[in-house]
């Protein structure tokens, strides 16, 4: 059995097991991963809501229209074949160019705010660290070791 995390995507694979074992283990892994993905998306929205603005002094969040925060979602685990499932959390829907600038830092250009440096938010990195730790702990709780 293996669970891999890469770029906001969780991949679960079970090899060399009987069909019954695969089904039972995959059901448990699917449930654990779906919980982690859902919690991870909520964490991402919280990070946006609690990371001070890079543009407005004294503003305690990065919410203007709410679109960037609302775009943080999760895709539940989907079966790719009998022994493999994939799911994701983060900006899984429409991604605007400014999301990347908020995430990684860089120059903001626009008529409303003018050109200003945006400090990075690092939401995706923070999400990954939290979700990875949560996933490992929940799998240890379910399967041991």
Q: What function would you assign to each model-found segment?
A:
Residues 1-88, 99, 103-145:
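Short, Lys/Arg-rich flexible segments
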């Amino acid at each position: 059995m293996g669970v891999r995390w890469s770029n906001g995507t969780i991949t679960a694979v079970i090899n060399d097991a009987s069909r019954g074992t695969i089904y039972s283990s995959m059901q448990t892994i699917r449930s654990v991963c779906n919980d982690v993905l859902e919690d991870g998306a909520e964490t991402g929205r919280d990070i946006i809501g609690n990371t001070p603005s890079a543009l407005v002094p004294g503003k305690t969040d990065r919410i203007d229209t709410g679109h960037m925060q609302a775009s943080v979602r999760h895709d539940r685990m989907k079966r790719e074949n009998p022994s493999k499932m994939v799911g994701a959390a983060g900006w899984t829907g429409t991604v605007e160019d400014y999301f990347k600038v908020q995430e990684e830092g860089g120059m903001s250009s626009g008529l409303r705010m003018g050109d200003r440096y945006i400090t990075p938010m690092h939401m995706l990195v923070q999400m990954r660290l939290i979700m990875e730790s949560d996933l490992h702990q929940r799998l240890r709780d379910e399967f041991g070791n």
